[in-house]
Regions:
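CoA-thioester-processing core
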Residues: 121, 125, 135, 141-195, ...
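Glycine- (often His-adjacent) and acidic-residue-rich active-site loop
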Residues: 26, 80, 88-123, 140, ...
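Acidic, divalent-metal-coordinating active-site segment for phosphoryl/phosphodiester hydrolysis
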Residues: 142, 198-205
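C-terminal long alpha-helix characteristic of the crotonase
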Residues: 155-161, 203, 212-260, 264, ...
Length: 280
């Protein structure tokens, strides 16, 4: 019954077109640090957030974070978005982490507020209503890895991607969810080791540990992880979105509630015997 409902039931979804910004062959055209793109044709339903701050290797500065939050708010309202990919427009880097030069100019109070905003950003990514994929073709350090950890799936270039929570080597500690998400991904003991040492991992090493889903050989263009993320997104597209899936589950469960078999199953569990189902 669930299979039939999943394949036939459709839920109306209001269409609100995305405001696309510069996700073309010239990603710097829009002059923004964060650009939003909705793909078309067979890729319709895939949206991309392009991080493009070459002067600071996509470091998480005030403007960068504000534009990321703005992009997520825009995408969250578009129910046609079925998969969201985070990628970089800066060759050799995904996100270099916190903008320490900018942070050095902040007061202690300002630092506290900004780190709180970073945590909020990662929470927004983790709570995004569609599957999210981080395409790491280059360095993902500190907050950059925390951003990737907030995504559902991670794809990395085998050799050119370098990742790690390196804050302890800077006299800091992970402050945007890394201490929580890394242990949930790898287990407590291994996460502690990586955080305490600030160790950097290649894409191959990260895949071996289970930190990334796929590690792919880099190509001449330097965007192999992005291409694998696109292919993965295309596989996800036919699947029902989470909200509709939960609605389907609710419909199926409601049909089960009044049945005699449901009551028989609970009675059998209570009486420690095998159930005698009658199909009613």
């Amino acid at each position: 019954m669930l299979r039939v409902l999943t394949s036939t039931l459709r839920f109306p979804r209001p269409w609100k077109p995305l405001e696309t910004r510069g996700c073309s062959s010239n990603p710097g055209a829009a002059g923004r640090e964060i650009q939003v793109c909705a793909l078309a044709g067979p890729n319709q339903g895939i949206a991309e957030i392009l991080m493009n701050r070459p002067s600071a290797r996509n470091a998480l500065g005030n403007v960068f974070v504000s534009q990321l939050l703005e992009a997520l708010a825009q995408l969250r309202e578009d129910r046609q978005v079925r998969v969201l990919i985070f990628r970089s427009g800066v060759k050799g880097v995904f996100c270099a982490g916190a903008d320490l030069k900018e942070r050095e100019q902040m007061s202690e109070a300002e630092v506290g507020l900004f780190v709180q905003r970073l945590r909020g950003l990662m929470t927004e990514i983790a709570a995004f209503p569609a599957p999210t994929i981080a395409a790491m073709d280059g360095f993902a350090l500190g907050g950059g890895l925390e951003l990737a950890l907030a995504c559902d799936l991670r794809v990395a270039a085998a050799s050119s991607a370098v990742m790690g929570l390196i804050e302890t080597t800077r006299g800091l500690l992970p402050g945007a969810g890394g201490t929580q998400r890394l242990p949930r991904c790898l287990g407590v003991a291994l996460a502690k080791e990586l955080i305490f040492t600030g160790r950097r991992l290649s894409g191959v090493q990260a895949q071996a540990l289970g930190l990334v889903n796929h590690a792919v050989a880099q190509n001449e263009e330097g965007n192999a992880a992005y291409h694998r993320a696109r292919a993965l997104a295309q596989e996800i597209l036919p699947q029902v979105d989470i909200a509709s899936g939960m609605a389907i589950e609710g419909i199926c469960y409601a049909q089960n509630i009044p049945t005699r078999d449901r009551l028989e199953g609970m009675a059998a569990f209570r009486e420690k015997r095998l159930p005698r189902f009658v199909g009613e």
